């Protein structure tokens, strides 16, 4: 799995730098490093996933984000079909970081999951305090939950 796109600048050397924190988090997701993923979040962090699919909601607290949202999404993939996550763009301004990534894998439904995602991260004191994730939720519904195909 690739965690940074060719040409994407490497994160800074300060481990608390917001851009570095987000790049390190996405890299941990791509590697499947659950310990590093969990350590990326503040204890009271929030993750907002808008839309009207079963994953939609506001997840409050580091453990809820990891155990219910991230691991909950993980079981929607076929055995051995865990998505490959590729970071494609990162823009940072102070404590705000916008990251784009692709996620591709085989869903438990037998359908291919291939989505472009965007997250607006807030980072403070070297930890992610909030994320607002945007993705094609119609594709999420069709591929991960077996919703009707277009056409």
Locate predicted features:
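Hydrophobic pocket/interface hotspot
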Residues: 25, 37-38, 45, 61, ...
